[in-house]
């Protein structure tokens, strides 16, 4: 038996439960069908065969889940941060224990190759560990002094939140959104994408088996137009974290406006990789190929526009074309596969249509550009490179979200910057140059939320993740995640410094509450009393008291 056959047999054993019992919603710790009994079918992009029947939640199901999240919120928010930390680490341990199952199910549900999905499960565990370690300090604030005033800030969880996750790398991206929400003390209603619902089900059951209380994490499957909309409009849901298309993000903002929803969006991208003639061309080519063709090109941070200095354009694109042609397209469970099938026939059709658009616009196909007859007859598309393109072409302006790279030449630094910024998106950028001064100058003006210099996308969890323009609102990562899931509260103590002699080092009884008086270096009393205008010991007014209100 080959390694591929062995992996397929394992995958079938992991998927058997879904084929037999389907995928139910999980609300308040219970498996439940949709309120009206509706279902939909999820298929594998490998062979287009059904994987499971999935409960199709709608407004009634979202309402039930939101009420469960609301009921669980007070106790979960009140749990000490150290206790939440321990529980989130238990969830991470449980993810690691089931990492193979998660990876194999994700491969068959999304078409992503095992080469990358084996790591994605472990990255999901690391997301939980990272935010678990920060849970005890999540509420910590600052002490801010002003003349006559001390301000103390703290943070409190915002309440029940909605999490809407995409079909690309759904397990890892779900952990990226859910782990900080739980660490902050929020309860959640999670609606995964309908194209890839299976690992979301694994994740919620892993969390509850690790000890997460009922109602803290609720899962409702369904379509965007019913379950998604009901979630974004529900009055008990205080915020929405969403990863997906920019157009959908705009719709969510409109739907949440009546209830003044806080929103955090990670949206589309048309990210440039800018290669100057002085760059290490071989390293830059490897990085460009990795950032567009890994994960099937179905990633928000993919470098889908290749901007190359004219003097090395032909040489560099030839290197990239040769590397693209050598990429193995195949079954996602084959250990050698880099590019597997695209997630769904609907998406495959979109990608193939864009390839035809590029050809009709006059761009040259230097590699790929065709449907591949892969194992199982699924949604396979070859790694594609367009050369001879310009920035006005649709393939250079619109997000394709597949293994399609568009290469455009530039004259000089100013031209490169103008081309890089001339799109509606601004998620990431990649810059390759040996000139450090140029790198600082260029990144200062590149319109992107994240930029990597002489590197592919290498994430460091404490750093901010997010885009500008049509690529998103807000930042994930580090403390930025807590800023979204928590409200900041300020408490101001107003006082005034006194210089008169009297009761130095004594104790005033103010309204029955003791307030100690200390001495400053000039011999005058300095204190913060707890009330204004009350009598002190022996009926005398306290020397120091709260200042008059402003």
PLM-predicted stretches and their roles:
Residues 1-45:
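Hydrophobic face of amphipathic alpha-helices that form TPR/SEL1-like repeat modules
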Residues 49-138, 148:
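Glycine-rich loop-to-alpha-helix module at the N-terminal edge of alpha/beta enzyme cores
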Residues 49-53, 237, 274, 328-329, ...:
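Conserved C-terminal structural/oligomerization subdomain of aldehyde/semialdehyde dehydrogenase
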Residues 50-57, 72-78, 162-163, 273-276, ...:
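Short, well-ordered beta-strand elements within core beta-sheets of diverse protein domains
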Residues 96, 139-283, 410:
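Rossmann-like NAD(P) dinucleotide-binding subdomain of oxidoreductase/dehydrogenase enzymes
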Residues 239, 247-390, 414, 453, ...:
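ALDH superfamily catalytic-core signature
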Residues 521, 533-535, 541, 545-549:
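Alpha-helix boundary/capping motif
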